[in-house]
Each structure stands twice: as structure tokens, then as C-alpha cells.
Curated annotation (Swiss-Prot):
One of its GO terms (cellular component) is mitochondrial large ribosomal subunit. This is Large ribosomal subunit protein uL16c. Pfam families: Ribosomal_L16. GO terms for molecular function: rRNA binding; structural constituent of ribosome. The gene is rpl16. It is found in: Plastid, Chloroplast. Signal peptide: none annotated. Keywords: Chloroplast, Plastid, Ribonucleoprotein, Ribosomal protein.
């Protein structure tokens, strides 16, 4: 699972997901990509599940780039705990994804294989996505 090696602070504010992504919205490494169409928090488990699904589908050959990284800690309070007594402890990590952000890129495979692999990865994501081709 992806997570930062160290962070400056253990806990973060939840924040808001306004607007569209101005960074990370162009294909940089591969030829095909999966682009987000909705805002969401994507957990490190979901990112890993999508990556595994893609790599299993293409087997050998081709290359996969993961363009998002979970760098936001999500805190969870223990169940049946009374209000107060501070914020909960960090439980898992998420990547904040806005519309337009590229999630995965793929290269070195024919388009039909890439389309199939990326559609399997998109089914692992909690948001609507689209398949795009560079050029």
C-alpha cells in the first residue's frame, strides 16, 4: 500500500474539493490514460487494486504509471466513543482527486488491450472516469 514515509504533521484538516484539476491533467509518460471526471478521495487500497488489475490484465509487456499518491491522512475515532477528547488517530491514507486528474497511464501495448485493462481499473475506482489517448 502507498503511504508517505514521513510527514510534517500527523493529522490534516478535511478540506474541500472545489473546481477542476489544473495540475496532472495531461498525459506525460504513456500513450493511454484513465482520467477522473468527479471529485473524490481515493484510498491507497483502491489505487493498489486498480494497479494490480491493470498489470494482471496486460501480463508482461507494457508499462504502467500511477500518477496519484495518497498523501492525506484520514483519522477515525474508535466506535462508541463520546464526543470530545480530541481528534481520532490516523487510520488510512487518501489521494485528493479533482475532475480532470490523470490516475493511471499506460504505454507499450495496443489500444484494445490498454482499453480493456484501463476499464477493469476504472471499475475499482469510486468515481466516474474516462479513457483518453495522447496526441
Amino acid at each position: 500500500m502507498l503511504s508517505p514515509q514521513r510527514t510534517r504533521f500527523r493529522k490534516q484538516h478535511r478540506g474541500r474539493m472545489k473546481g477542476i484539476s489544473y495540475r496532472g491533467n495531461h498525459i506525460c509518460f504513456g500513450r493511454y490514460a484513465l482520467q477522473a471526471l468527479e471529485p473524490a478521495w481515493i484510498t491507497s487500497r483502491q489505487i493498489e487494486a486498480g494497479r494490480r488489475a491493470m498489470s494482471r490484465n496486460v501480463r508482461r509487456g507494457g508499462q504502467i504509471w500511477v500518477r496519484i499518491f495518497p498523501d492525506k491522512p484520514v483519522t477515525v475515532r474508535p466506535t462508541e466513543t463520546r464526543m470530545g477528547s480530541g481528534k481520532g488517530s490516523p487510520e488510512y491514507w487518501v489521494a485528493v482527486v479533482k475532475p480532470g486528474k490523470i490516475l493511471y497511464e499506460m504505454g507499450g501495448v495496443p489500444e484494445n488491450i490498454a482499453r480493456k485493462a484501463i476499464s477493469i481499473a476504472s471499475s475499482k475506482m469510486p468515481i466516474r472516469t474516462q479513457f483518453i489517448i495522447s496526441g
